[in-house]
Amino acid sequence: VQVVSISSLKGGVGKTSVTTGLASAALAAGIPTLVVDLDPHADASTALGARPGDQQDIGRMLKAPRRARLAENVVPSGWVERASGSGGAPAGLAEAILDVAVGSAYTGIYDRPDLGRRDLRRLSTVLAGAEQYELVLVDCPPSLNGLTRMAWSASDKVVLVAEPGLFSVAGTERTMRAIQLFRQEFAPNLSPAGIVANRVRTGSAEHTFRLAEMESMFGELLLSPHIPEQANWQQIQGAAHSIHHWPGESAKSAAALFDALLANLLNPDGRPAAAQVRDRIHR
């Protein structure tokens, strides 16, 4: 299982959009995936079409992590049924898994800056039951408080989401320093998987300048491809659709970008993306 936290220091940069875009790409590739919605706003759960019944939300599971039964409390994303019924599903999709550990305001009790080591291990303990998945995506709150640190403690990699703007770039630099300090003290095996430039406006001189600044500051940590601003993204999320099953050329182009981004995220050694996806589907 590869656990990846999707983080940002600043709200409004499209962190949850990147999480759901990567989840959509994983579903299209047939990669068994769990999305853990640690943000108390639970926007990822809504966008993924997760409709919980009697299942515990992730906050309740974190309260008693040793007794938490993850497999019994995850909720399947509504995307799976829709994708399976579309008739155009790629090979391997029938067996694909996209589950959600549903978010709730209850997780907010852990979103404080003074969590001790025992509390930081709560998510790691819950995810001990995640062996059926190849990929776990953790949607973090837009802060560096307890929930984000709990996610980092359970993760193999951290992806930072940033808009190419002055304050977002500065926030990303601070977050990179915070990750380095956190690694030294709590999680020596944690690695920054990279930085996703999101909501990029190709015609904006400011965005072009900030992207060049990000390339200079972060080098190879700036992941490719960049994700352009998607005018209908709120409509897609509001309808609880995956980007891969939304009609139109702009959605199709965005889906291809998330396919490439997922391949680069899971495949840092540079093997061709097509081979990477093929290996995962037929493993």
Residues of each region from the PLM?
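P-loop NTP-binding core
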Residues: 1-283
